[in-house]
C-alpha cells in the first residue's frame, strides 16, 4: 500500500512556533523531487514536543498542501493507548491516508501489552496503520513473533522496522509473508532491507536529498540493482551524518545550512555542537548540497 521513498518530514520552527509557510515549502520540495509519501509528526517531526493543537495543525497543513498528490501518513503514536486512538481518529477525519504508530515509550509494555495496544487502535480506527519499532528510542523491542500476531489485522498494513537489524527484518518477512509490508526505518540499510523484501524506507535523509532516496527505491523496483547499490553506497556517509547527534538535530541543521528552514529545535533538544556542525558542513559540501 505504502512504498518507495517516504519522508519523515521535519517540523520547522521560527521563534518557538511552527512555521507554516516553511512547512508548505518543504512539502513542495519533497513532491517536486519524487518523494512517494510524507509522514508529518514522526520522530523527525518532533512529535513528542508538539502540543495537541500543534500536532493536528501540522497534520492538516501537510494534508492540505499535498492535496492528494501523494499519500500522507500521520504520526499518531503515544505511550497512552487512548491518546493514540484519539490522534488516529482525528488524523483520519483530517484526511490522512494512514497513520504511523510508534511503540509506547517509557512505560515499557510487555509483548502482550504491545499486542493489546495495537489491536485496540486497529479495532477502534478504520485507517491503514503502520507499526513503528525503534527500540533505541522507546526502550522496548517489538519482536518478530509479536508482529506476526498483529499482521493478520485488516487495518495493520506495514511496519517501520528501525532496529538497524537485517536479521530482525528478515525474521519478520519470513514469519509474516505477504500479510504485512516492511519498511526500512534506517537510511543506511534501505538497499539491503529491500533486497530482503522491504517495500521502501521512511527516510530522514530524504529531507535534504529527496531525489537521491527516491531514485534508489525507484531503481530497485525497476530491477536496476546496480544503480540502487551505487546510490546506497554513495549516500552512506551522509546517511550516517544524520545521526552524529540525536535526530532531528543534524537534519534540521542541514536544512538550515541549505536555507530551507531554521535549524531551530525544541528543548530538551538543543543546537548542534560547533564541532559536529563543522563536520556536517564539510560532508554537505562534499555532496554539493551547500
Swiss-Prot record:
Q: What is its EC number?
A: 4.3.3.7
Superkingdom of origin: Bacteria
Q: Where is this site: Part of a proton relay during catalysis?
A: 43, 106
Any Pfam family from its record, for instance, is: DHDPS
Where is it located? Cytoplasm
HAMAP family associated with the record? DapA
Its family remark reads: Belongs to the DapA family.
Give the protein name, as stated in the record. Answer: 4-hydroxy-tetrahydrodipicolinate synthase
Q: State the organism named in the record.
A: Geobacter sulfurreducens (strain ATCC 51573 / DSM 12127 / PCA)
